[in-house]
Amino acid sequence: MAKSPANNAAQRVRKKVRKNISDGIAHVHASFNNTIITITDRQGNALSWASSGGQGFKGSRKSTPFAAQVASEVAGRAAIEQGIKNLDVEIKGPGPGRESSVRALGALGIRITSIADVTPVPHNGCRPQKRRRI
């Protein structure tokens, strides 16, 4: 016998517990293909996250500043629901969504206390990949 649809509808949905954390860190990973924003508390526990691809942008539109802005608005609203009021922003990567994601977080009413560039730069470490020839 087939299962009744009432069983599927009766599944429990867990609601996120409001944590009331006022200070946090926004980690912005801006690559050439996508932008990922993760908002954590001071200890590094993730409160919310969003990406350009997760907001419905596909292909080359993921790497636009507008897509990064939309993703940071989504992550910022979820963080505000958790009680975030102040953010330190850490930006990693050379992508086009670096500046627009920080502006979007500030426009939501979150106070940005510091902006740091934490892009990893090698001290002549590993050999890079071969040059692309088109």
From Swiss-Prot:
Q: List cellular component terms (GO).
A: ribonucleoprotein complex; ribosome
Q: Does Transport count among this protein's keywords?
A: no
Protein name in the entry: Small ribosomal subunit protein uS11
> What Gene3D superfamilies does the record tag this protein with?
Ribosomal protein S11
NCBIfam families under this entry? PRK05309.1 (NF003698), uS11_bact (TIGR03632)
Q: Name one GO molecular function term.
A: rRNA binding
Q: What is the lineage of its organism?
A: Bacteria, Pseudomonadati, Pseudomonadota, Betaproteobacteria, Burkholderiales
Q: Which organism is it from?
A: Delftia acidovorans (strain DSM 14801 / SPH-1)
Q: Which InterPro entries match?
A: Ribosomal_uS11 (IPR001971), Ribosomal_uS11_bac-type (IPR019981), Ribosomal_uS11_CS (IPR018102), Ribosomal_uS11_sf (IPR036967)
PANTHER family noted in UniProt:
40S RIBOSOMAL PROTEIN S14/30S RIBOSOMAL PROTEIN S11 (PTHR11759)
Recorded hits in HAMAP family, A to Z, give: Ribosomal_uS11
Give a yes or no for keyword rRNA-binding in this entry.
yes
The gene from which this protein is expressed is rpsK
Whom does it interact with, and what assembly results?
Answer: Part of the 30S ribosomal subunit. Interacts with proteins S7 and S18. Binds to IF-3.
**Stated family:** Belongs to the universal ribosomal protein uS11 family.
Q: Which Pfam families match?
A: Ribosomal_S11
Q: Which GO terms fall under biological process for this protein?
A: translation
What keywords are annotated for this sequence in UniProt?
A: Ribonucleoprotein, Ribosomal protein, RNA-binding, rRNA-binding
What does the function comment of this entry state?
Located on the platform of the 30S subunit, it bridges several disparate RNA helices of the 16S rRNA. Forms part of the Shine-Dalgarno cleft in the 70S ribosome.
